[in-house]
């Protein structure tokens, strides 16, 4: 068997599994084909340049339809802002912009389409620039990363050393920059002048808020106030702190501030304020309040003790004097002792008496009008509460006489009872619900003594039997009045007129207010310190204290007490509250000689509450809707001038005065007179109702003032200032009026 020779057969070629060169070749071919396709698509979409308008062929017209469709699609995407860096290279709108045939509508150019194409071209151009920038950035970043990787692999140690050197250089540069940025002098940064242009004045803001466009309410003078010195100021609710006039006090306060120890910044400020306040208060005390311990707030009530539960209404308190106390205490003690003895005798009944009589007697004592001191005198006479009661101690009176201390205790206690009654029951100048309260009826003393006297038991038993018999008779009479239904009804007896009538008698008809409560005036002494028209504004006392000090020094002299006149109300009816309160009561019967021990007042207030500086209460503003009124002032002036109808008279007078000369000027011509009230009423004929609502009298008067300045009119008011009369003024001859007439 012959062996086949190997030379006649071709060698077998095995394909390589990973051929990099072949793969690169295929990738290049694919990319080349894609580029050709893109170029061909772009070239097909571009219209060929027309050499002339006349050289038009059916071939060009056939290609015009896809070009227009692509153009409209690209414009739509451009207007919708759908062009970005990824699809910007697929639009060929920039290449078609030079072709004006796409922008024409017949013979005219569609500028709206041209503006849209220009906007789209700008968007495509900017997006292409962005895409180029991003692609180049990616390329540069990739190259930089590759170079860094190669440097790290090849030069590992050298790269670390270079990085350390770079970090050291950066640290050195930062240190140098920190020195440059710091400011050596702080004064260069400090703001010397504050920018106050943007800030607004709160008073100006309030004035603008209160401004009213309607008329005179919005004027500036109507929003200003007058202070106690007569100055016109804004309505600010800040308290004014007056500077001290005593320079010595200021010097002492400054020395105290300098000598004060300073530990820190915070303690320094607190010590300064403390020293200033103490020194100023000491100086004020030395100047004004040196003799404050010897003064009394209200000398007429010096020996009076107020009740904690009662009302301290000064208008209801009566000034007490020593001689009046002597007169009242004697009668008061006699009356109270008699009444208390009688009441005690009525209460000292035997144990066999009923409890109802005792309760009735207590009610009598409680509601007895002639004995208002029952609840006060027993307390003063109680020996357990007053251990010194009964000891005969004498008190020297002003006139040299003596008075027992027991009587003085009873008198002061009785006076307390009087004022407690007035404070609780009559503090509002009327009885209130107690006016209709049913009070217990008084019984005769003989009947009470026969019932409660244990000595006359026989008489009491007879009276009791009589009372029982009377009650039995009444019950029998009530039982005898039985109705018999079997008897015939007497018609005449049924219809007989009754003796008693249901109507009120005629005597009560005139007194129709007899069953009504009295008028509730609710008088209060604080009304003396308030204004009538502005009740929230209180009259402040004399804050200066200059004239008041001299008055107090004159009054404090004990030798001149007899010459002091009572500080009552003036004869002309004017009561000046700032000059002080009448120290001897409101009546004319009190005189200064009756109260020699009482010192005159040195303060001008009713109590401690009025010593504080009271702020002026701001009235509550009503929140109401404001509507801006729109008035044409020029039209209003024209209509008012027509209503006045003075133009013809002015022209006639000017012509006559020009012709006749000075003789006509000297004579007084009878000028027509128009009233402001009538002219304003004539506006109703020219304006509609809606427009007339916006026109106020202030607007009309302002327009009349303008007309008076322009046409030389004379304004005069009547006697009661209720109306203004308008007439032409003198010397109205002008050359301009004559030229206009000619």
UniProtKB/Swiss-Prot annotation:
Its main location: nucleus. Changing residue 114 to T: In cnd2-1; defects in DNA repair and cell cycle. Coiled coil: none annotated. GO terms for cellular component: CENP-A containing chromatin; chromatin; condensin complex; cytoplasm; cytosol; heterochromatin; nucleus; rDNA heterochromatin. Pfam families: Cnd2. One of its GO terms (molecular function) is chromatin binding. Residues 154-165 have a biased composition (Acidic residues). Residues 21-39 have a biased composition (Basic and acidic residues). It is found in: Nucleus; Cytoplasm; Chromosome. Residues 53-62, 452-470, 592-604 have a biased composition (Polar residues). Transmembrane segments: none annotated. Signal peptide: none annotated. Residues 1-62, 151-172, 452-473, 564-604 are annotated as: Disordered. Belongs to the CND2 (condensin subunit 2) family. Regulatory subunit of the condensin complex, a complex required for conversion of interphase chromatin into mitotic-like condense chromosomes. The condensin complex probably introduces positive supercoils into relaxed DNA in the presence of type I topoisomerases and converts nicked DNA into positive knotted forms in the presence of type II topoisomerases. The condensin complex probably also plays a role during interphase in processes such as DNA repair. Component of the condensin complex, which contains the cut14/smc2 and cut3/smc2 heterodimer, and three non SMC subunits that probably regulate the complex: cnd1, cnd2 and cnd3. This is Condensin complex subunit 2. It comes from Schizosaccharomyces pombe (strain 972 / ATCC 24843) (Fission yeast).
